[in-house]
Amino acid sequence: MLNNNDIWSKVPPILCYCCASILMTVVNKFVVSGAHFSMNFLLLCIQSTVCVVCVATVKKFGIISFRSFDMQDAKAWFPISFLLVTVIYTGSKSLQFLSIPVYTIFKNLTIILIAYGEVIWFGGRVTALTFVSFIFMVISSMIAAWSDVSSGLSGSVPATIAGAVRGLNVGYFWMLVNCLTSAAYVLAMRKRIKVTGFSDWDSMFYNNLLSIPVLAIFSIVVEDWGLENLGRNFPAETRSFLLTAIAFSGAAAVGISYTTAWCVRTTSSTTYSMVGALNKLPVAASGMLFFGDAVTFGSVSAVGVGFFAGIVYAVAKNNQKKTEGRLQADAIIPLASRKP
């Protein structure tokens, strides 16, 4: 039985994880929602640089530890970092065109892709209850898309309908690419971690460090670095605040990694997955609160169904873990029962 002190000791890491997750999503949405913002690669390069500086600083104070830079490890990990660049870039482009509730709900589809990827490449298993949660995830995404299109077109004059539809189509394209690359990143990283033996902090350090040159090159080659475009992306009246927000979002990435490890260590992976499912509700609500995302029956229903799907998924994974644990225990033959 847990006493009150044990219960209350688990509250801070859970709250910190939720706050870090909400802050990161809201700040990223704020940065990319500028009327003329187009320098996503530069944004991500700054975030990764801040992240590496923060992690190195925290390591220097002895709060965390991870292995020092090694060229062989870097070569082995570079494909994973490149995949991460595509994940973060497509995610930022999705947020640029889609509302936070829609983005949050559609991220659930990545779980389905990862689950069946694990079935194909790692001998994973999808239980009946897990499949039910997947059905609800798909339904919530369909409701979100319907609500998003309806609210985007309602009240639009005929001349602007084509532009609204085009913007939504671009947003859903980036969301699809983001789901595919996110699943590929997670599955490839799982395989690579077994080869390199990386810890969570090792992965974070190498991911961000190796992504900096890639992002910098893409930014220089693809993006317009002319003074006029820089002025549009970083207006003089909001430049300081915008750069501070970008730096803060990079630090928030470190916060999410730390609070994730803290939450899993002080509670359990099951509690963490449940918190992640429940946290989708305040993340979606933050978009409605801070960015004026449409609060309609469809949008609220989509968030509710997605919220329920997350809970069902967390329960399904918990049950599956317990079942697999029992099967492993049953497979162990006691020494006293073995025949000579």
Swiss-Prot record:
Cytoplasmic side: 1-6, 58-77, 123-125, 189-202, 262-271, 316-340
Keywords (A to Z) from UniProt: Cytoplasmic vesicle, Endoplasmic reticulum, Golgi apparatus, Membrane, Sugar transport, Transmembrane, Transmembrane helix, Transport
UniProt membrane topology term: Multi-pass membrane protein
Disulfide cysteine pairs (residue numbers): none
InterPro entries the record matches: TPT_transporter
Annotated localization: Golgi apparatus membrane; Cytoplasmic vesicle membrane; Endoplasmic reticulum membrane
Membrane-spanning parts: 7-27, 37-57, 78-98, 102-122, 126-146, 168-188, 203-223, 241-261, 272-292, 295-315
Lumenal topological intervals: 28-36, 99-101, 147-167, 224-240, 293-294
Any one Gene Ontology cellular component term annotated for this protein: cytoplasmic vesicle membrane
Keyword Transport: yes
Membership in a protein family: Belongs to the TPT transporter family. SLC35D subfamily.
Subunit structure: Homooligomer.
Function: Involved in the import of GDP-mannose from the cytoplasm into the Golgi lumen.
Name of protein: GDP-mannose transporter
Species annotation: Laccaria bicolor (strain S238N-H82 / ATCC MYA-4686)
